[in-house]
Amino acid sequence: MNVIDTDDLEKHTPMMRQYLTMKAEHHDMLLFYRMGDFYELFYDDAKRASELLGISLTARGKSGGDPIPMAGIPYHAVEGYLAKLVQIGQSVAICEQIGDPATAKGPVERKVVRIVTPGTLTDEALLQERQDNLLAAVYQGKVGFGYATLDVSSGRFVIAELDTKESLEAELQRTNPVEILYSEDFGELGLLSHFKGKRRRPEWEFDYDTSIKLLLAQFGTKDLHGFGISDARLSLQAAGCLMQYVKDTQRTTLPHINAIIRFNQADSIVLDAATRRNLELTQNLAGGRDNTLAAVLDNTATAMGSRMLQRWIHQPLRDPNQIIARQTAVNELLKTGTHEPLHEQLKALGDIERIMARLALRTARPRDFARLRQALSLLPELQQSLSVLNAPHTVKLCQYLGEFPEEQALLERAIVDNPPMLIRDGGVIREGYNNELDEWRGLSEGASDYLVQLEAREKERTGINTLKVGYNRVHGYYIEVSRLQSSQVPLNYQRRQTLKNMERYITPELKEYEEKVLSSQGKALALEKQLWEQLFDLILPKLHELQAFARAAAELDVLSNFAERAETLGYICPQLSQDIGVQIDAGRHPVVERVSQTPFIANPVTLHNQRRMLIVTGPNMGGKSTYMRQVALITLMAHIGCFVPAERAVIGPIDRIFTRIGASDDLASGRSTFMVEMTETANILHNATAQSLVLMDEIGRGTSTYDGLSLAWSAAEYLAQQIGAMTLFATHYFELTQLPDLMAGVYNVHLDAIEHEDTIAFMHAVQEGAASKSYGLQVAALAGVPAKVIKAAKHKLQQLESRDHQLEGTKTPIQTLLALPEPAENPALTKLQAINPDNLTPKQALDLLYELKRLS
């Protein structure tokens, strides 16, 4: 059944009419419909929930003549089920009973009070603690894309204007949003294929004028000039869609979203999607976090510090002043030993960033206030530890920590030491905070003494020794007497409940007291909830200052973490140079050295204006890929302000890092391994500059020998002579080792290995010059290839080598390649390249077509 079809509602029961009407308003998400102690799902929602959550699918009678498929979950277990759903990209509308069942005529009044989507989560139980939870929107213009991300759990709002599809792909890889909004006419759906939470939105939600009005209203400004984003038209359209979506789902004000930042690619080293993937920065090739750069560098004290570190890793700085400011701060923390006590103090702060977001949305829980109270109480001690530091960047961060004595004192007075998880049952507001609340609680809490006295008095009056006075939530207060003695009860005892061996009674006196106590409990709880809401009003005026405190604490955490990692892992402070180049002495791969069972062999690299390309040769498993990756990772670490695994490192200006390392079939896009390889190569050749660091590994291996050799040769030549990029070019084509003899700035290096009889020992040491051979058969033997196959391969190798020596003039394949004449100029192609089709009339275009036919 199509549950959003409301044309024939009259044939359904009143309750199902209510359900179907609400479902029509939330047709693209599951509707959790509260019925007593359960959330129920019906029709297609029930079937889908049963499939996704593994819960039973049943039926609830009939409505409109048809059985109603139904599934349900207990209300007290809802958070666990919500967590499962949002992890797979599913959104949920939660419909609660807001009317009183006792007074309702017909179905109890219900209302959707909360919408849970993957990208708008703020509940601590549903969020990944150490990962940003980004909602994104993308809008495609005639030229380029607008991209916006918003972390509702922190208030961080960022936009970017992107010129190309490749830039958008890189941003998607960098930000890794959990939910993406896109317009109806978005033309690059292939880029979104592997994201779970995709939402197609109507075109009007991306309207420019509407977007501007939404943003101005949100920030309370007359224009957007102060944010430096007035000309970012496409990304502002995406940002407007985000704001509309968040307002629709949160259904409250969003005061913690009070600024918007423009991400400018020119401010950071550009890392394309392939590079982020190949270097395994925050996610390994299997999709996990183990054995990534982030896993090695992250020993932060707080979750908010961990999230900031990952953003830094994906956004290495280009401005040397910003990098040096971080380095200076880390150096001082290290030399003074301040990082050790600072780490412990920050650990006690908790995740203030997300707590402040929940406060702003008024969804904070009692324990959030208790954690904020603890964080504020730690501020004097934290500032005392930092007072010995003089690095300008650290001093600036300390200024943002602020002082909040009034807010701390308020929370000390208002919240009990160990509050319950929820406000709904009371027990959150401390005794002495409000006199009226204390009075109502006194009436309720005095009930125990009263009941003890009543029980003793009634036993004495009636002579019934089995008499007890008790209470439960269903029947209230009662006097309980055994069945054997029930005939002795006085006439004023009114039977309330009959059990197997007991009778329960109520008296007019006990009934009157019950009403008084229950009334006081209800009034105490209502007043406590009112005082709870007032706490939000008293804390929120300091929202912006508390957010600044959270950001400063997170950055201090990252810097302190860098100091600890440098000390623990033996890292040194890299030197920044104005001259193009990368000089690393005894560099180590930061990840491999941590997981390797044997001592890591450190290696150098030298790249500069006169030495721009290294042709890297050596056996498989010899360490070529590890060597190349470590150069890129050390360079990246230097640009986030982190110390690096080396004895010495001098790093010049870098604008981009490219890696073409490893490849596999892209089945989703229908691209072969070779096609993926060539696409990545084309991206490098089009976008690399003289300030780029390029890693190229085994170009051309996915095609025939001569095709592959030709492509590898030409790519290396183009990088060396046309672009002049700093390049590590690993290859098994030994013909490429002749390049240094033919081109300036190109040098050979190789990974050493020692052969002994039929075995090989990998030395993993980088040496100048070309490798003597590839040792392919020995590696195959180590891998367990059968001895018969190895023997046959040796025989075939001898035949091939013998034949090669007999070739005419003993020319190498590359000499043959170089001897080929330059292709003749094609007049038709020359003519075509000179044409601007936008300037042609239809008649001119037709005449030109005939001329091109003649020239060809």
UniProtKB/Swiss-Prot annotation:
<dbReference type="InterPro" id="IPR017261">
    <property type="entry name" value="DNA_mismatch_repair_MutS/MSH"/>
</dbReference>
<keyword id="KW-0547">Nucleotide-binding</keyword>
<dbReference type="GO" id="GO:0003684">
    <property type="term" value="F:damaged DNA binding"/>
</dbReference>
<keyword id="KW-0067">ATP-binding</keyword>
<dbReference type="InterPro" id="IPR007696">
    <property type="entry name" value="DNA_mismatch_repair_MutS_core"/>
</dbReference>
<dbReference type="GO" id="GO:0005524">
    <property type="term" value="F:ATP binding"/>
</dbReference>
<keyword id="KW-0227">DNA damage</keyword>
<dbReference type="InterPro" id="IPR036187">
    <property type="entry name" value="DNA_mismatch_repair_MutS_sf"/>
</dbReference>
<keyword id="KW-0238">DNA-binding</keyword>
<dbReference type="InterPro" id="IPR007861">
    <property type="entry name" value="DNA_mismatch_repair_MutS_clamp"/>
</dbReference>
<dbReference type="InterPro" id="IPR036678">
    <property type="entry name" value="MutS_con_dom_sf"/>
</dbReference>
<dbReference type="GO" id="GO:0030983">
    <property type="term" value="F:mismatched DNA binding"/>
</dbReference>
<comment type="similarity">
    <text>Belongs to the DNA mismatch repair MutS family.</text>
</comment>
<dbReference type="Pfam" id="PF00488">
    <property type="entry name" value="MutS_V"/>
</dbReference>
<dbReference type="Pfam" id="PF01624">
    <property type="entry name" value="MutS_I"/>
</dbReference>
<dbReference type="Pfam" id="PF05190">
    <property type="entry name" value="MutS_IV"/>
</dbReference>
<protein>
    <recommendedName>
        <fullName>DNA mismatch repair protein MutS</fullName>
    </recommendedName>
</protein>
<dbReference type="GO" id="GO:0140664">
    <property type="term" value="F:ATP-dependent DNA damage sensor activity"/>
</dbReference>
<dbReference type="InterPro" id="IPR027417">
    <property type="entry name" value="P-loop_NTPase"/>
</dbReference>
<dbReference type="Pfam" id="PF05188">
    <property type="entry name" value="MutS_II"/>
</dbReference>
<dbReference type="InterPro" id="IPR005748">
    <property type="entry name" value="DNA_mismatch_repair_MutS"/>
</dbReference>
<comment type="function">
    <text>This protein is involved in the repair of mismatches in DNA. It is possible that it carries out the mismatch recognition step. This protein has a weak ATPase activity.</text>
</comment>
<dbReference type="InterPro" id="IPR007860">
    <property type="entry name" value="DNA_mmatch_repair_MutS_con_dom"/>
</dbReference>
<dbReference type="Pfam" id="PF05192">
    <property type="entry name" value="MutS_III"/>
</dbReference>
<dbReference type="InterPro" id="IPR016151">
    <property type="entry name" value="DNA_mismatch_repair_MutS_N"/>
</dbReference>
<dbReference type="GO" id="GO:0005829">
    <property type="term" value="C:cytosol"/>
</dbReference>
<feature type="binding site">
    <location>
        <begin position="618"/>
        <end position="625"/>
    </location>
    <ligand>
        <name>ATP</name>
    </ligand>
</feature>
<dbReference type="GO" id="GO:0006298">
    <property type="term" value="P:mismatch repair"/>
</dbReference>
<keyword id="KW-0234">DNA repair</keyword>
<dbReference type="InterPro" id="IPR007695">
    <property type="entry name" value="DNA_mismatch_repair_MutS-lik_N"/>
</dbReference>
<dbReference type="InterPro" id="IPR045076">
    <property type="entry name" value="MutS"/>
</dbReference>
<dbReference type="InterPro" id="IPR000432">
    <property type="entry name" value="DNA_mismatch_repair_MutS_C"/>
</dbReference>
